[in-house]
Curated annotation (Swiss-Prot):
The keyword Repeat applies. It is found in: Cytoplasm; Cell membrane. This is Calpain small subunit 1. It holds the Pfam family EF-hand_8. It comes from Mus musculus (Mouse). GO terms for cellular component: calpain complex; cytosol; plasma membrane. GO terms for biological process: proteolysis.
């Protein structure tokens, strides 16, 4: 994804991948259990800013979304992803937890050190089966393709080690938040619980954007299950980072041409 390149550096070249090794689900289940809590345009370009668009329902909706994201992006300050480093240079400085995670990654990814959407789906579904308190229909292939796309800095269609580790650390953090804000222990987060959960994850959104998210990711009763919660936060994280990387002067406005806009919206 062309925008992710500017803020997420990691990953290698790409071929096939490995399967789930023996005990892999158990080890990853342990890792995720240990998570800590908290935490419009013709011509050459298309301007995307804080104001609403003119003319037509589609432009009004787009203007509202961009306005909401520009406001929220100004308040979103996540930890930066790790820089690209050669394997041999970083191995000596890795903690024991990271070293074990790298071994795990090699088991999953195989010699090419890349994780495909199918492999990601398998491992996530393996993990959530160990957590009956998390209500989920399971991670589908389309959801995992979207997750890979927004994290795929080199557009190989797969995730390298740093990309996967960054995603995995976020999933651990968001899982803890999900459980903390599931106050009625229903296994889902209701619409009244969502604002607190999103703010704990670092996303301060307005009511209009919350309503759009609920219509897109929640069920008819307004409840969001675990896989939809994670899918939504992965998308928000990527879109906010993309916006902030392009808004270099902090004006709350960005300008992209039609090709950049299509790359941003189609490969995600």
């Amino acid at each position: 994804m062309f925008l992710v390149n500017s803020f997420l550096k990691g990953g290698g070249g790409g071929g096939g991948g490995g399967g789930l090794g023996g005990g892999l689900g158990n080890v990853l289940g342990g890792l995720i259990s240990g998570a800590a809590g908290g935490g419009g345009g013709g011509g050459g370009g298309m301007g995307l800013g804080g104001g609403g668009g003119g003319g037509g329902t589609a432009m009004r909706i787009l203007g509202g979304v961009i306005s909401a994201i520009s406001e929220a992006a100004a308040q979103y300050n996540p930890e930066p992803p790790p820089p690209r480093s050669h394997y041999s240079n970083i191995e000596a400085n890795e903690s024991e937890e990271v070293r074990q995670f790298r071994k795990l990654f090699v088991q999953l990814a195989g010699d090419d050190m890349e994780v495909s959407a199918t492999e990601l789906m398998n491992i996530l579904n393996k993990v959530v089966t160990r957590h009956p308190d998390l209500k989920t229909d399971g991670f589908g292939i389309d959801t995992c393709r979207s997750m890979v796309a927004v994290m795929d800095s080199d557009t190989t269609g797969k995730l390298g080690f740093e990309e996967f580790k960054y995603l995995w650390n976020n999933i651990k953090k968001w899982q803890a938040i999900y459980k903390r804000f599931d106050t009625d222990r229903s296994g889902t987060i209701g619409s009244h619980e969502l604002p607190g959960a999103f703010e704990a994850a670092g996303f301060h959104l307005n009511e209009h954007l919350y309503s759009m998210i609920i219509r897109r990711y929640a069920d008819e009763s307004g409840n969001m299950d675990f896989d939809n919660f994670i899918s939504c936060l992965v998308r928000l994280d990527a879109m906010f980072r993309a916006f902030k990387s392009l808004d270099k002067n902090g004006t709350g406005q960005i300008q992209v041409n039609i090709q950049e806009w299509l790359q941003l919206t189609m490969y995600s």
